[in-house]
């Protein structure tokens, strides 16, 4: 299979679907887990935060290692480790502490497959198609999350969270096998660094790169907080209309899966638009719409569920739409020898912020009692504030004279 071809990209995207089904396992079953594991909202958010922090550390380490030994090699090791840890999590996560430890270890394994996958796409897909290719790659992530949420919605009412965990853990095993088959013959590229070239000059003093990283950091705060708590919020909306908790959790997972489907569509569409219109205009449009949704969404508890779901679909579309463009942009404003290092810093900042978001969100819920529209409203506002900072970062990027490469279209309209 020719690296960079349509068939190669399709296969690596499908492997992404399976690999990331386990990513949302905890959030999808959270309403049931809070009761079964006797967790407060703060404790529940703590598990999500530890996952994101471990994921950030893994992304940083694996990205830096990829610069030195090649992205292909690190990607393959990450897929194998992810399959093993997914199976262990599904089999042995049965209370707060086992869930915390195993979910954190799972995050360390999954981190080996994300930025290394981004690097593989950047290395093998021509620049004129890179935006849409990155969009399709990240769309595989969203499809995996949607599939996992749908499976969880079926499983929790039939076999509880253990059955849900077992079903979604099959994804990294199948996805890992597909990834191994596709990527094993892809060249392992190691770009040597020119003498005198240093990280500080290539990244830290690179204004467009740092503004992209700043935008991505607060985008991640908003997105990962939203992903962590939207299934529970939708479950609360169903419970508020009279559903039992288990049924509400299942319905919430179903509806959250649709949110991720719109995110998948956004990734693909935004990638195409970014190639045609330029990276910055599409980032600004998506970030602005997502911020508005964050500021409104939580206050809808108690309104008709159809209204909540409708806005949730728009929210899911906008919140993820700019993600592949940030990933593409950072590879275009940093010299190839330092792409991994730049992605490492981006990942540490973004997923570090994403680790804080669920914990702060849960703390706000506890502060306001956890059940009212006021509690959910202010919790989602905390995500909207981060989204607003992302918008400001993109506006500053649009005014940077050395960021012109991100303004122009890559293909003819």
Predicted features along the sequence, with ranges:
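Symmetry-related core transmembrane helices of the 12-TM Major Facilitator Superfamily/SLC fold
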Residues: 163-180, 377-395
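Juxtamembrane intracellular "pre-TM" segments in multi-pass secondary transporters
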Residues: 1-2, 186-214
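Cytoplasmic helix-loop-helix junction between adjacent transmembrane helices
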Residues: 102-140
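Helix-loop-helix hairpin linking two adjacent transmembrane segments in secondary transporters
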Residues: 137-181
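Conserved MFS/SLC helix-loop-helix module at the cytosolic interface between two early adjacent transmembrane helices
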Residues: 57-93
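C-terminal ends and interior cores of transmembrane alpha-helices
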Residues: 80-94, 288-302
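Cytoplasmic membrane-interface "Motif A"-like loop-to-helix N-cap segments
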Residues: 68-78, 276-287
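Extracytoplasmic gate region of multi-pass secondary transporters
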Residues: 26-27, 210-260, 357
């Amino acid at each position: 299979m020719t690296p960079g071809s349509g068939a190669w990209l399709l296969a690596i995207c499908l492997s992404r679907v399976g690999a990331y089904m386990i990513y949302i396992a905890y959030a999808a079953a959270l309403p049931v887990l809070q009761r079964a594991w006797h967790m407060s909202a703060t404790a529940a958010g703590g598990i999500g935060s530890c996952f994101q922090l471990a994921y950030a550390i893994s992304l940083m380490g694996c990205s830096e290692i990829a610069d030195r030994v090649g992205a292909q090699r690190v990607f393959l090791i990450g897929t194998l480790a992810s399959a093993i840890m997914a199976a262990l999590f599904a089999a042995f996560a049965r209370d707060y502490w086992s869930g915390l430890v195993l979910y954190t270890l799972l995050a360390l394994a999954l981190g080996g497959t994300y930025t290394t996958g981004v690097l593989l796409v950047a290395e093998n897909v021509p620049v004129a198609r890179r935006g849409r290719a990155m969009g399709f790659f990240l769309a595989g992530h969203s499809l995996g999350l949607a599939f996992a949420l749908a499976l969880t919605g079926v499983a929790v009412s039939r076999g509880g969270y253990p059955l849900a965990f077992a079903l979604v853990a099959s994804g990294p095993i199948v996805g890992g096998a597909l990834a191994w088959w596709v990527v094993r013959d892809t060249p392992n590229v190691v770009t040597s660094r020119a003498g005198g070239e240093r990280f500080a000059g290539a990244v830290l003093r690179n204004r467009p790169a740092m503004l992209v990283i700043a935008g991505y950091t607060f985008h991640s705060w908003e997105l990962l907080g939203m992903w962590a708590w939207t299934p529970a919020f939708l479950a609360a909306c169903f419970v508020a209309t009279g559903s039992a908790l288990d049924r509400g959790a299942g319905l919430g997972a179903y509806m959250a899966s649709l949110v991720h489907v719109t995110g998948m569509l956004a990734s693909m569409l935004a990638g195409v638009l970014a190639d045609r219109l330029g990276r910055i205009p599409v980032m600004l449009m998506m970030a602005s719409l997502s911020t508005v949704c964050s500021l409104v969404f939580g206050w809808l508890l108690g309104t008709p569920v159809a209204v909540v779901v409708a806005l949730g679909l728009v929210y899911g579309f906008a919140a993820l739409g700019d993600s592949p463009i940030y990933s593409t942009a950072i590879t275009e404003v940093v010299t190839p020898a330092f792409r991994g290092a730049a992605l490492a810093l981006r990942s540490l900042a973004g997923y570090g912020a994403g680790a804080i978001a669920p914990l702060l969100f849960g703390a706000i819920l506890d502060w306001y009692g956890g059940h009212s529209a006021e509690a959910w409203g202010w919790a989602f506002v905390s995500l909207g504030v981060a989204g607003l900072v992302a918008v400001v970062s993109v506006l500053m990027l649009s005014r940077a004279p050395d960021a012109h490469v991100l303004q122009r279209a890559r293909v003819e309209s």
